[in-house]
């Protein structure tokens, strides 16, 4: 079986049979699958958002952990504002694209590219952080696996990549069960914990964390740091807005309903977990997560309900990365359409998924996981900057949008988006100030670097379009064509190449590089019989180089006729087995590479298929 057949069968086994374009509408999300695929990032963040707040407050003393509750309510209020703002964006921009499209239409090129860079970087970090956190949950339960955490993170990236390459509908089916399992298990935990609180059956959780004397003074900076840490609960909110075209018709209505459901669930679970952490006097620990401690306290130990919560939490943390797999390729395709990234990212694969974007996201996330050793705490400081940059630009762009339209109720709409822009802008400043010392400055550096690359890519495509333009061009000149057939001997492949060459031009020459005089004399004798009147050019090579004399001769012919074409016809063996290639030199490939960037020189191969 040929190599192409083996590769094709392997591809079909991994990603399934191709899907025709006319079935694209069947591959879209319902609200049920849309909530699972596009909201898993936002929903999963509640698993560690409360803990991130407590980890800062405990630096002062256990006594100030109660400040987590008002901080959580403030974050919940901001989340509600952002969701209502994005809901307006969904209806105003049903084509998707989120912050990039809104900023491009209303704020101009530069803000749009900043938004795009922020989102693309954040999507890569979403995959890395989510998978690292999920693997951390596994290795906490099975410490022996800790040494293999990098391999495990890469394995999960591979699973997510293959799942998404199979297409939108199948990825929705794969990821719906873990998402809803997490939602129901956490809501059950909160409901049972609330019932225990109402009946007065709450007992503080036993912990191995030593009680430490007061450390730092509770300052405004520490409160802001705790607040910025808790804002991880807001990551992923923009995913639904970016993925509107992935929904079944009516797209905007289904996406808006999905966003409201996501907001209600996220706020309920985040505030519920924070209240339970306060009720059970949970102290953050390096050995056990806050959700684990709450589940242990609510369910009275490590029974099956506890393991159900932990298992669901682990799954959602890993699968939260799937939100990025839904949105990164789609945003990249929009940027490719606008010529800011390579055009290959615009193409859909066999399964109507943006395959190149999916593979690229997997590669970048894998690099991050390897560089940072799969450590969640090393990756989290890089998080959130991109989110709030895109939030702020999107909402500011919507204010301009409503001011330009001035339709019914435009002032109310502009006020809602203006409030969203102001709030997210303030949060962005807080996050940038409190996270820069922990590595967020890298993201602040990467965003302008990406913008520079976007603009450089656009300049390249614009220059290509200018050079390819037919404006002012006349096709009045007839060009001659000199055809050269390099050969290493006289055989069937050469004779076949000569027959083809004679169909291209009347000026055909065979070219042979002489290294051995005896072999050259023998070849000249054979050429009289098989050359069919085609002139034979023999090039001497005193230093035994095959390439240099040939390239010099091609350059000489080209210089003699600078406005005409020179065509190189290469006789080329095609072995019956892929491994037979090792028995043949790759001279044809070397010639192609050497002539690739030479103008007016055309290189073509005439394959001679060898039988088995």
Q: Which residues make up each language-model segment?
A:
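Cytosolic C-terminal regulatory domains/tails of membrane transporters and channels
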Residues: 1-21, 462-612
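Loop-to-transmembrane helix boundary motifs in multi-pass membrane proteins
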Residues: 109, 147-154, 246-269, 336-370, ...
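Hydrophobic alpha-helical segments and their helix-loop junctions in multi-pass secondary transporters
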Residues: 182-209, 273-281, 392-407, 456-465
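Membrane-interface loop-to-helix entry segments
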Residues: 160-195, 258-262, 380-392, 412-423, ...
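Helix-loop-helix junctions that connect adjacent transmembrane segments
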Residues: 24, 180, 185-235, 434, ...
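Extracellular/periplasmic helix-exit of transmembrane alpha-helices
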Residues: 194-201, 257-293
């Amino acid at each position: 079986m040929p190599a192409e057949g083996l590769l094709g069968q392997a591809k079909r086994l991994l990603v399934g049979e191709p899907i025709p374009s006319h079935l694209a509408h069947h591959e879209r999300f319902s609200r049920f699958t849309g909530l699972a695929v596009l909201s898993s990032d936002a929903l999963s963040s509640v698993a560690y958002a409360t803990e991130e707040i407590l980890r800062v407050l405990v630096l002062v003393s256990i006594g100030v952990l109660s400040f987590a509750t008002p901080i959580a309510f403030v974050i919940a209020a901001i989340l509600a504002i952002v969701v209502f703002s994005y809901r307006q964006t969904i209806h105003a921009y049903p084509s998707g694209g989120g912050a990039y499209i809104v900023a491009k239409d209303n704020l101009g090129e530069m803000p749009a590219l900043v938004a795009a860079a922020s989102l693309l970087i954040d999507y890569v970090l979403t995959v890395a952080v989510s998978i690292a956190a999920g693997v951390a949950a596994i290795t906490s339960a099975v410490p022996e696996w800790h040494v293999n955490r990098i391999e495990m993170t890469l394995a999960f990236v591979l699973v997510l990549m293959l799942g998404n390459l199979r297409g939108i509908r199948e990825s929705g089916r794969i990821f719906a069960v873990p998402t809803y399992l997490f939602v129901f298990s956490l809501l059950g935990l909160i409901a049972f914990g609330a019932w225990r609180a109402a009946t007065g059956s709450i007992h503080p959780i036993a912990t191995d964390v030593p009680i430490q004397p007061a450390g730092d003074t509770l300052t405004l900076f520490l409160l802001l740091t705790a607040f910025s840490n808790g804002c991880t609960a807001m990551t992923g909110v923009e995913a639904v807005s970016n993925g509107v075209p992935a929904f079944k018709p009516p797209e905007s209505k289904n996406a808006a309903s999905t966003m409201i459901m996501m907001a209600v669930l996220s706020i309920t679970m985040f505030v519920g977990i924070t209240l339970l952490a306060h009720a059970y006097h949970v102290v953050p620990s390096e050995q056990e997560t806050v959700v684990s401690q709450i589940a242990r306290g609510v369910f009275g130990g490590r029974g099956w309900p506890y393991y159900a919560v932990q298992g669901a939490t682990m799954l959602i943390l890993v699968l939260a990365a799937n939100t990025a797999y839904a949105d990164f390729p789609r945003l990249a395709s929009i940027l490719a359409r606008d010529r800011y990234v390579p055009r290959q990212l615009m193409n859909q694969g066999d399964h109507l998924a943006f395959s190149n974007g999916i593979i690229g996201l997997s590669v970048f996330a894998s690099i991050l996981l390897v560089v940072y050793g799969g450590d969640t705490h090393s990756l989290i400081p890089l998080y959130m900057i991109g989110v709030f940059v895109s939030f702020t630009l999107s909402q500011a762009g919507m204010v301009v949008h409503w001011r330009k339209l001035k339709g019914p109720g435009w002032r109310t709409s502009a006020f809602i988006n203006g409030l969203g822009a102001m709030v997210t802008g303030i949060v962005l400043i807080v996050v940038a100030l409190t996270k820069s010392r922990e590595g967020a400055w890298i993201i602040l550096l990467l965003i302008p670097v990406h913008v520079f690359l976007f603009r450089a890519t656009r300049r390249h495509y614009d220059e290509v379009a200018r050079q390819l333009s037919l404006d002012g061009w006349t096709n009045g000149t007839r060009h001659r064509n000199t055809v050269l057939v390099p050969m290493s001997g006289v055989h069937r492949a050469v004779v076949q190449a000569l027959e083809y060459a004679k169909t291209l031009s009347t000026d055909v020459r065979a070219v042979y590089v002489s290294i051995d005089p005896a072999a050259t004399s023998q070849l000249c004798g054979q050429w009289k019989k098989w050359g069919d009147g085609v002139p034979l050019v023999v090039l001497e090579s005193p230093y035994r180089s095959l390439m240099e004399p040939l390239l010099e001769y091609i350059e000489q012919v080209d210089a003699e006729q600078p406005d005409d074409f020179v065509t190189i016809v290469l006789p080329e063996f095609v072995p019956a087995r892929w491994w037979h290639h090792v028995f043949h030199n790759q001279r044809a490939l070397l010639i192609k590479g050497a002539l690739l960037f030479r103008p007016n020189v055309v290189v073509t191969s005439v394959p001679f298929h060898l039988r088995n």
